[in-house]
């Protein structure tokens, strides 16, 4: 093992993190890629050192509610497993421990361990790459952009996109909000009443107990085999909706309706109302948070509820319409302020019913659409990955890019939905 530090050795600075960063602080992004060629690790390390010039938080250490950008470095490890071939690596589950990069999250949170670690495992005819990164530093958008930049530096010597480090972005975005100012200056009883009037759900003991029990039993880590949805099938449903209603619907709405249709009998949803929760990226949506913002800018929004008995086309139209309403400018501005005030004051509320999401027969599901991430954009100069495993977060439904050559989408289910 060794530490990789920034090439130009920047001066030490303190970077303040936002309230959205802080709520993600305990989490770790854990991504694996499989390659059918052996990587040039010397080139990868050189490019990583150059990358860290533009990503100072990754080479720093946590200090209170911020990161000391002291260029202490990230952890790098290489290992040989030449007895393994690509065909020996299972794709239906996250790779076994021998291929995992070391990451001590408890020590990282205490400022005593790197915020990112990398492991290259060489096989007889390829390699497994594992990158672990503290969610405190980045959300999915920022992480995969960073990986794309690293690969581009190794391959061409040029960054694809310049990261936008602005520690005041979220704070400035909230400064103009009357709702936010009112909430943070009010007493707890007033704030709780306001949150409940806005449709927020209080997190109860039952939900916490169910979460803890399922985590203890490992049920939350169950991962289904991917359900492959061809692009032509998505296009066909979009066309049917257009012909029947005269309205266009997005790809996401179609995939959501197909997921519910697939789960309806498996989950016993006939005759029931389901609530679908989406994760939304606020980059380019919220004034002041740019497209290349380096940090956390994504969170769940209020759910869309509908009958599970509806035809796919009707579900897709309803989901699309409701999401557009939820993400309309005025509603989104208000919700952004509510959400940030809620997490800043550490109040036990969520925009959806956690008890319903973690019950033995859940009717609330969280959907995480990862299709906009360039997951397969990690060609370091010796060829791109042939497979990328889904993240091991417990989102019940995840839309994931299919491997190169497959024209469609992988849909994964986790926990009780698997």
Write out the residue ranges for each language-model feature:
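Non-catalytic N-terminal regions of enzymes
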Residues: 1-192, 218-228, 234-292, 350-418
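A short acidic-Thr-Gly-centered motif at the start of a beta-strand
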Residues: 117-124, 197, 205, 209
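Helical lid/core segments from catalytic subdomains that handle acyl or acyl-like groups
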Residues: 224, 293-375
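Acidic, serine/threonine-rich, charge-biased low-complexity segments
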Residues: 189-201
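Acyltransferase donor/substrate-recognition loop-hinge adjacent to the catalytic core
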Residues: 203-220
